[in-house]
Amino acid sequence: MIKTKEVTFVTILIVLCVFISTIHAKRYIEYPIRLDLGKGCDPRFPTAACYKRTPANPYRRPCTTANRCRRSTSSTRVPSLKTFVEIPPM
């Protein structure tokens, strides 16, 4: 009885080893692609080059009338600096 169990166990082990060896195992687990990572970046080992760069200070000064910025709704004409400061010829 014990001999039969040993033979059955060894036979099952051999069959399992044959089936396991024929399966093509992957070297690593493939994760779904994340959109915030750059192309070719590994999510397990992200580097600074993988992420989209954002400026340290994204604040921009607003455009004022004194700066004479281009405006689409501006109907008033801003006078130039020469009209405010007229230097008489000497």
Swiss-Prot record:
Question: To which protein family does this belong?
Answer: Belongs to the plant rapid alkalinization factor (RALF) family.
Q: Give the protein's recorded name.
A: Protein RALF-like 29
Q: Which UniProt keywords apply?
A: Disulfide bond, Hormone, Secreted, Signal
For this protein, the record's InterPro entries field holds: RALF
Q: Which domain of life is it from?
A: Eukaryota
Q: Name one GO biological process term.
A: cell-cell signaling
Leader sequence residues? 1-25
Record carries keyword Translocase: no
Residue pairs linked by disulfide bridges in the UniProt entry: C41-C50, C63-C69
Question: Its GO CC terms?
Answer: apoplast
* Predominant location category: secreted
**What are this entry's molecular-function GO terms?**
hormone activity
User: Is this entry keyworded Secreted?
Assistant: yes
Report any Pfam family annotated for this entry: RALF
Gene name? RALFL29
Where found? Secreted
Query: What does the UniProt function comment say about this protein?
Result: Cell signaling peptide that may regulate plant stress, growth, and development. Mediates a rapid alkalinization of extracellular space by mediating a transient increase in the cytoplasmic Ca(2+) concentration leading to a calcium-dependent signaling events through a cell surface receptor and a concomitant activation of some intracellular mitogen-activated protein kinases.
